[in-house]
Amino acid sequence: MSINPSRKLSANLRECLANAGLASLMTVARLKGEPSERALTGIRAIRDHLLKVEKELDDLPSLQPEEMAKAITNCDPDPEWRERILRGMTLVAMFDGEPSASALNLLEQTAKAFQVEANPVNTYRNVMEGRMLATRFDLMRRSFVRDAVAATMKAGGLPMFAATLKALSGVRDETVLKRFESLKHYPDESFGKAYSEFLDRNNFNYPGDTGGIPIPVFRHDCCHVLGGYGTTAAEEGAVIGFQAGFEGLDPFDVLMFAMAEFELGIGVSPFIPGEFGKLDPERMFAGMEHGSCVNTDLIRDIDPWDYFEEPLETVRTKFNIVKRGREPEYPAA
């Protein structure tokens, strides 16, 4: 199933899907009684940044899975909408505290009523049952990391593969390091200079250095620079939301990387420890809205080196990266 976050909706379809979809999300949030503020924050963010409607959540009914399926299908029989809403329900369930058997049962019944694949539900089950190794492997396999590695190999072939293995082994690569350190001398206001300043500001080792990030991951860091995102846990969630908006992957899989790393405490990345409850749901879905305007997959379809010499604002304009609307935030020194 292909899910396109930038797909345009008519006003009538938007209103219909908002009624059915938000009621479905509220059904999950009410499973334990009064919805938690964290679950409500996530639902409001979906309402405001993805559905873009004005709707009082308290006025929406709770629905049985068959009622959800009927309401959504009456809006549009395209299964993409049922796929999207099942994913949204799963994310809300994860924002609502410890995974529960009641939420899992609702999600399983909903996937059956929707007649769609239950991949999001399987992810929820793995988290609930503590299958951390399976969860990590699944997320790495389906997240943006896969495309970043493939794009790096396509751009650099075997030398880049060897350099990536060196980084993962903690071995210094002088050739790679020298190339990346040359960005410090690029013109002011250039994309390349902005990337080097991003590394310096965060005290990150340059690719190629001992302790530096593997080369594929630098594509993610370039999204921080292009989109204007910082490096707190909330900002990391926001930039991954930004990526979910433009990548040709299932947005759920992209967002789940952030959920696992910064909300559920599952350390998917080998470079940073997992954290609990550090995501900002509003910021993450605002990032997804931001990324949906971008006209190119910035992970898979460009080599940042082709653009490092250009002014940062020129590169942003080329890829239709509009101003984010808030300043990036960084961890306290």
Over which residues does each language-model region extend?
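Generic signature of intrinsically disordered, low-complexity segments enriched in small/polar residues
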Residues: E117, V127, D147, F198, ...
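Core of folded catalytic or high-affinity ligand/protein-binding domains
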Residues: P159-E310
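Small-residue-enriched hydrophobic alpha-helices in membranes
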Residues: M1-K178, E275-P281, A333
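Short, flexible helical or helix-coil boundary motifs
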Residues: L50, E54, C75, V92, ...
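Acidic, carboxylate-rich catalytic segments that either coordinate divalent cations
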Residues: T296-A333
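Charge-rich, low-complexity amphipathic helices
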Residues: R47, L51, Q115, E129-L133, ...
